Amino acid sequence: MKFNSDMLKIYFVAGTQDVANKADFLPKVEEILQAGATAFQLREKGYNSIDNPAELTELAEKCHQLTQKYHVPLFIDDDVDLALAIHAEGIHVGQKDEKIESVLKRVQGSMIVGLSCNTEAQVKQANQLDGIDYLGTGTVFETTSKADAGAALGVAKLQELVELSHYPIVAIGGITLDNLPQTMATGVKGFAAISMFTQMTAVPTQMQKIKAIVKG
């Protein structure tokens, strides 16, 4: 699957640790995909996540079946071996994960590559690299979904990074329906979220509101 920045519009990120009952995870993923998510990232990380390799591979394969059903890319967070093993469409790399240069060498253009960049220095460094497709930038607003999220950037700083970047940016961190319009106004290509999706009720209605803002 070739990268298209439209993939970043409604970017769902989650792992089993993000739902109260692990049995609800795959149904929730399908519900959000069916309602119009444009990408899904399996981020199985932190307290109460799956650490058994066989179980994780099985979960990733099931997620891939769902993303293929709805014709959207599956990204694997910080696990090149897993991404390659299941032929995921993409890999997302954080600043504290495996070095991006190593990841690019390993995937050799076989998948979409996203990199977390949250400072001017990180964006400038990314601008010097070939093989990256997009940057994930945040946290834009305060969030409790990611323990390592750091201080919030705010929309003014986000816009500065968007203007600095050679690559399309997807915003993440504390994004809600209320602050989504100002987030999109910075020039980002889309937004990513965890709890906004995993805790969503009345999914079709909420997703229609999101689509209206993102396409605005």
From Swiss-Prot:
Family matches, as NCBIfam families: thiE
One Gene Ontology term of the molecular function aspect: magnesium ion binding
UniProt keywords, alphabetically: Magnesium, Metal-binding, Thiamine biosynthesis, Transferase
InterPro entries reported in the protein's UniProt record: Aldolase_TIM, ThiamineP_synth_sf, ThiamineP_synth_TenI, TMP_synthase
SUPFAM superfamilies, alphabetized: Thiamin phosphate synthase (SSF51391)
Organism: Pediococcus pentosaceus (strain ATCC 25745 / CCUG 21536 / LMG 10740 / 183-1w)
Record GO biological process: thiamine biosynthetic process; thiamine diphosphate biosynthetic process
Top-level taxon: Bacteria
PANTHER family for this protein: THIAMINE-PHOSPHATE PYROPHOSPHORYLASE, THIAMINE-PHOSPHATE SYNTHASE
Cofactor info, note text: Binds 1 Mg(2+) ion per subunit.
Function noted in UniProt: Condenses 4-methyl-5-(beta-hydroxyethyl)thiazole monophosphate (THZ-P) and 2-methyl-4-amino-5-hydroxymethyl pyrimidine pyrophosphate (HMP-PP) to form thiamine monophosphate (TMP).
GO annotation, cellular component aspect: cytoplasm
Sites where the protein binds Mg(2+): 78, 97
Gene behind this protein: thiE
Name of protein: Thiamine-phosphate synthase
Pathway entry: Cofactor biosynthesis; thiamine diphosphate biosynthesis; thiamine phosphate from 4-amino-2-methyl-5-diphosphomethylpyrimidine and 4-methyl-5-(2-phosphoethyl)-thiazole: step 1/1
Enzyme Commission number(s) from the entry: 2.5.1.3
Chain sites annotated for binding 4-amino-2-methyl-5-(diphosphooxymethyl)pyrimidine: 41-45, 77, 116, 146
Amino-acid positions noted as binding 2-[(2R,5Z)-2-carboxy-4-methylthiazol-5(2H)-ylidene]ethyl phosphate in the UniProt annotation, renumbered to this chain: 143-145, 174, 194-195
Reactions accelerated catalytically: 2-[(2R,5Z)-2-carboxy-4-methylthiazol-5(2H)-ylidene]ethyl phosphate + 4-amino-2-methyl-5-(diphosphooxymethyl)pyrimidine + 2 H(+) = thiamine phosphate + CO2 + diphosphate; 2-(2-carboxy-4-methylthiazol-5-yl)ethyl phosphate + 4-amino-2-methyl-5-(diphosphooxymethyl)pyrimidine + 2 H(+) = thiamine phosphate + CO2 + diphosphate; 4-methyl-5-(2-phosphooxyethyl)-thiazole + 4-amino-2-methyl-5-(diphosphooxymethyl)pyrimidine + H(+) = thiamine phosphate + diphosphate
Sequence similarity: Belongs to the thiamine-phosphate synthase family.
Cofactor: Mg(2+)
